[in-house]
Amino acid sequence: MILDVMFIVMRITNLLLIVSYEFVKFYCKKSINYFCNIPTYRLELIKNISKKLEQENIVYVKIFQALCFDKDLLSSEEQCYLLKYTDNVPYDTSEIDYDLLDKLEHDFSITLTNRTPINCGIVGLVFDGLDSSNNKVIVKMLKKDILQKFTDVFDELLYISYICKYIPYIKSLKITKMLLDNEEILLNQMDFIKEVEAIEIFTKKYKNNKEYKFPRVYREITEKYGNLLVMENITGLQFKDIELLDETVKEEFAYLLNKFAILGTLFHSVIHCDLHSGNVFFYINNETNSINNEVSKYGLGIIDFGICCFPNKKNQNAYYIFFNDIHYKQDYSNIEELLYAIIEEKEVFSSFNIIKKQQFINESIDCLILNTKDEITTQLLIDLSKVFNKYDFNFTEEFNKLILSIHVANHFGKQLSINLKATQTRVLADLNKFNELVFI
């Protein structure tokens, strides 16, 4: 027992030293560069910390990633770097459960085209395969003992967060709360049944939107073997394949991407929080049927549903106010309904006297006016967080996920569209025009 405690203390001390060293090194360099009039980018610090954490335990990077998204500490560029950083990581053959792969073939006639993974994330491994009808499938497998690794790392970071409560400035970040808020999100990424359910929900919600494709999942396999997820292979063009295409073509894809996100948030009550370029395939169909329009010329394939949320109808209406009234029309008449929906401490907000409540509302409006003229950026959440912190408020976990999805989708959208705000405005205008939004 004593040895276990000593081991944990040593690991925690080592982790603190690594992060502290990188911070000191970065700010020393920043100070020197300031006098030399040389720009210093914080992304360099993020990269260095990520590489050092990976050397200790790649799971640290995943939790570091989740914490930064939750508190809006990073720019969209920095966030997307972390997302892509964890897309393809090194693996060891000891992490592969070959016995389970044998059972998959024996019980369900799913054969792997190669037992070498085509991709490896922090949580799982991905293989190409074929089902009994020779249809191409993707097989996702959880790494051996990954849940225990997450639990160990999480406990260590909780100890560190308790220490951080006594460090000036850092204590204001409420790291312990951030860790506990994100524990469920991280664990859900290791629950393939939840991902199966998410894929089925998205497929059902978008059944009338033929421009979007989702993989068919083999639910019965995951129900028997919870560490496996087998789905249809819907591989299409990747971003690198369309990057140099004509801007008008990329603009069509940008429109579809934003339509997917806005429809999900405001109409279908489903939010995909990880909509970066690695999770989207592109389709160009030159044989569309103009009579029944069953197949659209341009389409998107969406994968990886490990981080999703499903807003209730009341919150959905608040998000409609955020996107349509405030962002699109600059109308703040329903701002109080929005604020009430995204505040965690609702009873405290309701107990405010009229003067204090109006002061909070006015400060929030000033922040929104300043930051919603163009596309929604990280700066909006940084500024709005300052207003919330002033009144001891926190964003709801759901709103944090919504903002994560906006950050990631907007960063990707800028790679597709020359004018993202114009594209988003066109989507909202079209949805309003054809009455495809539900007014609650």
PLM feature spans:
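Helix-to-catalytic-loop junction in kinase catalytic cores
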Residues: 265-266
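Conserved catalytic-loop position in the HRD/HxD motif
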Residues: 269, 274-276
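Broad phosphate/nucleotide-binding scaffolds in NTP-utilizing and phosphate-metabolizing enzymes
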Residues: 1-262, 282-317, 321-440
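Short, highly charged C-terminal tails/helix-capping segments
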Residues: 278-280
